[in-house]
Amino acid sequence: PESRTVLQQLRFRNNLVRARTRIANSLVAIALSCGAVRRFSVLTTKGRRRMAALKMSEEQAWQRDRWFEFLDGLEPVITEVERKLEAEAKKDPRVCRLMTQKGVGVLTGLALVHVLGPPERFATSRKVAAYVGLDAVESQSGQRRHIGRISKQGSRLLRFLLVEAAQTSARCDPELKAVYERLRRKKTHATAKVAIARRLLVRSWILLRDQIDIDEFRRRGRARCGVKPGQPEETHGL
């Protein structure tokens, strides 16, 4: 019941944010049709002033005002849901442990804990990746084996949050940044980003399974690779 409630809140928040994005895009479309040279954020005070300064027809102005009314109604609801989720995260040591990994915030941490459930039910990292749909689909033609796109089974919400988190991790986590840059030389940005999301997922599963934080995870990685404290870290698998 607890996991169901948290996941319902996460999905509700996600739907609200998607609605806000659709409204913002509709407002930008009005701005562009009224002579705006480039896209701009309509979610800021400055953006609203720019919208108000544009010359537009009476009908366009009416639509603009209605869209802003919808936005004004959404914002406090999004804020309220996010406060509930933050409170839930703060009291859960599992989420706090996951958030020691750069890129994993409140939303991703909660989704990981409540989608995966007990970490011991997954025997291997491949089973975790398959459960979330971040495993590569294999096909065979004659003597050739082809590894294609991810299967996209399981929780769409968790996959989305992990891919979003991967963008931050690829910038802020030295190990994952090195992996991303290496992959980016051979693959597309999207492929590299999904690969980082998969590594984040497996790391998170290990943190949950072993009840450790990211510092202990790295210490174990250095020990496994024979790297002494103070030496430059090499990427070590995950």
Regions found by a protein language model. Name each.
Residues Q143-I147, V179-L238:
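Low-complexity, acidic/Ser/Thr- and charged residue-rich accessory regions of DNA metabolism proteins
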Residues A19, I23, F70, V104, ...:
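Hydrophobic (often cysteine-bearing) scaffold residues that line and stabilize catalytic clefts
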